[in-house]
Amino acid sequence: MDYLTIALAKGRIEGESFKKFKKMGLGDSIDTDTRKLIFKDEENKIIYIHVKPSDVVTYVEKGVADLGIAGKDTILENETDVYEIYDLGFGKCKFAVAGLKGDSIYREDEYLKVATKYPNIAKKYFKEKGQKIEIIKLNGSVELAPIVGLSDVIVDIVETGNTLKANGLEILEDICNISARIISNRASYRFKYEQIQNIIRLFEELDN
């Protein structure tokens, strides 16, 4: 039997992913206290690779990994050609448009200035709404943009909303809910179907 390679995202959903694999008896080879990036489980024929969240979908799409665990935010932003096969139900938050309290999102015959770390998601959302936008790509502290006049609104991940409130901002419109998902390479899903379904069944049993 061939090894199944699974790409695991570092960061926000990392801890919960490792916990689930360990509960299923599949994570004993994973050591979170080491700088190693590859872990081999010879008994269960699984190789885990530890990568940046934004790279999980790339490893899966290119066939380096058969499966990956990544946030829905990463999947949407990267617009890659993979199968999304299971909602893990943790790492829950949402995408939202936020701005100064009482502000209006839409500008008739004007460009809306949108600051975000997720330009593809923002472009798609406002295109569907028929609103012309100017994207201002930021890598952090997106909430600052409307306050200092850099943008009209922001598109960002919101968990509790406390950071928005602390900075005088509010959610103006929800975009979509997000959570951690299992994604599969298209060819792997065909040729390693049984192995992949076995993993999914274990997750389903754990969640039910």
UniProtKB/Swiss-Prot annotation:
GO annotation terms (biological process): L-histidine biosynthetic process
Main EC class the enzyme belongs to: transferase
Disulfide bonds: none
Annotated compartments: Cytoplasm
Protein species of origin: Clostridioides difficile (strain 630) (Peptoclostridium difficile)
Keyword GTP-binding tagged: no
Subunit text: Heteromultimer composed of HisG and HisZ subunits.
Matches recorded under HAMAP family: HisG_Short
Residues annotated as transmembrane: none
Main localization, broad class: cytoplasm
Reaction(s) catalysed by this chain's protein: 1-(5-phospho-beta-D-ribosyl)-ATP + diphosphate = 5-phospho-alpha-D-ribose 1-diphosphate + ATP
Name listed for the protein in its UniProt record: ATP phosphoribosyltransferase
Pfam families per UniProt: HisG
Domain statement: Lacks the C-terminal regulatory region which is replaced by HisZ.
EC number: 2.4.2.17
Superkingdom field: Bacteria
Role noted for this protein: Catalyzes the condensation of ATP and 5-phosphoribose 1-diphosphate to form N'-(5'-phosphoribosyl)-ATP (PR-ATP). Has a crucial role in the pathway because the rate of histidine biosynthesis seems to be controlled primarily by regulation of HisG enzymatic activity.
Recorded name of the encoding gene: hisG
Gene Ontology, cellular component aspect: cytoplasm
One MF annotation (Gene Ontology) recorded for this entry: ATP phosphoribosyltransferase activity
Keyword terms of this UniProt record: Amino-acid biosynthesis, ATP-binding, Cytoplasm, Glycosyltransferase, Histidine biosynthesis, Nucleotide-binding, Transferase
Organism placement in taxonomy: Bacteria, Bacillati, Bacillota, Clostridia, Peptostreptococcales
Family listed: Belongs to the ATP phosphoribosyltransferase family. Short subfamily.
Pathway: Amino-acid biosynthesis; L-histidine biosynthesis; L-histidine from 5-phospho-alpha-D-ribose 1-diphosphate: step 1/9
